């Protein structure tokens, strides 16, 4: 896995990959069509952010590369990599409890706020890739 040089792309398995944490200058790509929605990505070494139809989906500080992102009514899955540990925030259903799994191990349950934001840390510095699964309880 590596940075997504084209900033965002659709994978053969109909998932999204995005983010290039190797960039020194901010880059963005808007109006990327995927499954009837329009996506926008902003990414560089300090932050990676994804929006769907103008609404928040994902943000990491510092920047990361995300592969095979899928989201449905029950949760979200993706793989993430970056040069150092990252704080990741995703948009889920508001005021709902989710369990977060990193590389198959539960990190516990977290309840989203009224805006639906869910935040967690991922230890990326000494890892090749971290598999993330967020599951509705």
Labelled PLM ranges:
Residues 76-78, 100, 132:
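Hydrophobic residues positioned within well-ordered beta-strands of beta-sheet architectures
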Residues 27, 31-42, 49, 86-88, ...:
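C-terminal beta-strand-rich structural cap/linker in extracellular carbohydrate-active enzymes
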Residues 2-67:
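Catalytic cores of secreted or luminal carbohydrate-active enzymes
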Residues 101-105:
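Short strand-turn-strand beta-turns centered on an Asx-Gly dipeptide
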Residues 65-68, 75-78, 108-110, 119-123:
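Beta-strand-rich interaction surfaces with strong enrichment in secreted/lumenal proteins
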Residues 79-96:
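Surface-exposed beta-strand/loop patches in extracellular or lumenal glycoproteins
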Residues 9-11, 16, 71, 81, ...:
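A generic structural signal for short, non-catalytic loop/turn and secondary-structure boundary residues
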Residues 1-2, 137:
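Short, solvent-exposed mixed-charge patches
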């Amino acid at each position: 896995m590596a940075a997504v040089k084209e900033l965002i792309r659709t994978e053969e398995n109909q998932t999204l990959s995005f983010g290039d944490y190797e960039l020194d200058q901010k880059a963005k790509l808007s109006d990327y069509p995927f499954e009837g929605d329009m996506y926008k990505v902003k990414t560089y070494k300090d932050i990676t952010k994804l929006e769907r139809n103008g609404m928040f989906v994902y943000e990491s500080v510092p920047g990361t590369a995300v592969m095979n992102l899928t989201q449905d009514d029950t949760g979200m899955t993706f793989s993430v990599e970056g040069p150092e540990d990252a704080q990741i925030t995703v948009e889920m259903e508001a005021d709902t409890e989710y369990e977060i799994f990193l590389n198959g191990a539960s990190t516990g349950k977290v309840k989203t706020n009224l805006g639906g934001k869910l935040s967690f840390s991922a230890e990326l510095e000494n890892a090749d890739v971290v598999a993330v699964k967020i599951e509705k309880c």
